[in-house]
């Protein structure tokens, strides 16, 4: 809830990974709320069991109240630390993405190509939870390569899970 109003799910992935990477059925999701609230706004909710993180972006100046495109992706390659998520983007639009992978060393080592800003946190020497924003997008398909870069203690040393969700607005 944001300001007492429930947010709407745009994109979500919560299925177990296969192919030899860590098979955790962890959730990565993007929710949104169109609001006229200003100033301090309370955000409440229950993250469920285990490690939970909520990142919040405020985006303004866009015409679409609902996403024009959404996508999810998951790494199942047991020789890879990265995964690309692709979605249809509009000229001068905005993409918000969410990702979860195993933790990095040093902390905060995840990168996302084509993003303007990334926010991330490593928790309990186990998982990295991150989000990115890409404003001023081009018309067409935009690819976001999400890379763990510096693995810390991956359950499978040669790969990592990447649980990715993204939504785009114009």
Regions found by a protein language model. Give the residues of each.
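Primarily extracytoplasmic/secreted proteins
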Residues: 1-170
């Amino acid at each position: 809830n944001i300001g007492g109003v429930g947010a709407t799910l745009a994109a979500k992935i919560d299925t177990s990974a296969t192919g030899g990477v860590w098979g955790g059925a962890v959730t990565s999701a993007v929710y949104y709320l169109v609001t006229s609230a200003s100033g301090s706004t309370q955000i409440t909710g229950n993250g469920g069991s285990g490690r939970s993180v909520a990142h919040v972006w405020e985006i303004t100046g866009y015409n679409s109240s609902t996403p024009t495109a959404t996508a999810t992706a998951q790494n199942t390659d047991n020789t890879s630390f990265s995964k690309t998520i692709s979605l249809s983007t509009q000229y001068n639009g905005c993409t918000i993405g969410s990702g979860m992978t195993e933790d990095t060393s040093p902390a905060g080592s995840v990168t996302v190509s084509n993003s303007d800003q990334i926010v991330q946190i490593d928790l309990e020497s186990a998982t990295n939870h991150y989000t990115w924003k890409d404003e001023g997008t081009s018309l067409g398909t935009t690819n976001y390569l999400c890379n763990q870069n510096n693995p810390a203690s991956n359950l499978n040393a040669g790969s990592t899970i990447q649980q990715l969700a993204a939504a785009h607005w114009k």
